[in-house]
Amino acid sequence: MPDSAHWVGTWTTAPAPAETGAFNNQTLRMTMRASLGGNQLRVRVSNAYGRRPLEIGGAHIALRDAGAAIVAGSDRKLAFGGAAAATIAAGAVLFSDPVALDLAPLADLAVSLYLPGEIPNDFQITGRYARQTNYISPPGDFCAAKVMPIASLTSDWFFVCGVDVLASPDTGGIIALGDSLTDGNISTIDAFCRWPDQLARRLLARHRGRPMAVMNQGLGGNRILYDIRGDSGLRRFDRDVLSQPGVTHVIVMLGTNDLRNRWKKPEEEPTAAQVIAGLQQMAVRAHSAGVKIVGATLTPFGNETYMADAWNPRREEVRLAVNAWIREAAALDAVADFDKALRDPEHPTQMLPAYDCGDGLHPSDLGYTKMGDAIDLALFE
């Protein structure tokens, strides 16, 4: 690797206040799928929302085999400034020291964290629901175990917010910034059906062009303008986009939850101009950092059952106005037309039934794949 090699995120998740989790002298083993290969790795651990310091008693990374098992010979003990244990201050992120491990693109990793102390519910754990099966041990440090004993299962990631690889100078990174439709809500667990997963597969399959990582920074419920289940898109843009290692492009799919106004607060009911202003601000901030921005059109939700009264004619007018701006905006470098990809031509306020998971809001596995297929790979040459 040349001296100009740089770190690029091969996997990420957006930190948020976890809705589950309490631990006491236990090991977590969590699965992540790499979008980009490499032979030098590091792990990022976040205590972004913790109310007090987080004690890490040990951490390992390995290639995942099946279930809670790891591939023999692939286990690597992580260190933090040369030490096996570490304390992460409230609100902080900790980077591990690099380790050597041959990682193929789209390979599954297992990151194990030993949490030696009690972490109660009021700690405010940092985590995200994962659409992956992850594992919690009985009491003890099982980071090095080839097959970790299992006390319980979880579909969340906890504390780990990124895995980076040392990559060639021309390698780029694509951030997928969005809400539950980027996070892959309702998609089949352990099937890797999110649209960023499909984008990563397509980028790898082209066998040419610039190497690109895909970092999923989707956050269920996320809005552009107001916080909900974590920071708003505008508030987290620096942390979840501009601060990510190796970022060169961002695809922004946000605005649907602004329109839906889940908490039904009149003062949070946005106009099209307010949503567009938020997207414009993201474009300015991206370009100021040398990052290209792709705007994704908002998909239809006219027959939504996930939340009663989410759709109304006024909100549809706002959606159409925002989409019209995205398709024509000089402020954006390109468009990913997810609305066109998913909508029913006969009922354009709704998704085509085959692309609808059944709640009128979230796509099916096929719909998520269709979204990943709708992105022009020429944008990343």
Protein language model annotation of sequence segments:
Residues M1-L177, S187-D190, R208, F380-E381:
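N-terminal secretory targeting modules
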Residues N121-T126, N185-F192, L225-R229, R262-K265, ...:
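Short, solvent-exposed loop/turn and secondary-structure capping segments
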Residues F158, P196, A200-L203, R229-Q244, ...:
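Alpha-helical scaffolding within the catalytic cores
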Residues T171-D197, G220-R223:
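Catalytic nucleophile-elbow at a beta strand-turn-alpha helix junction centered on a G-D-S/GDSL motif
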Residues G173-G178, T182, M212-G218, T248-M253, ...:
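Structural recognition of the beta-strand scaffold that forms the well-ordered cores
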Residues S187, L219-Q274:
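Oxyanion-hole/transition-state-stabilizing segment in secreted/luminal serine hydrolases
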Residues A200-M212:
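Signal peptide-proximal N-terminal region
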Residues L234, R260-R262, T299-E381:
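Catalytic His-Asp segment of secreted/periplasmic serine-dependent ester chemistry enzymes
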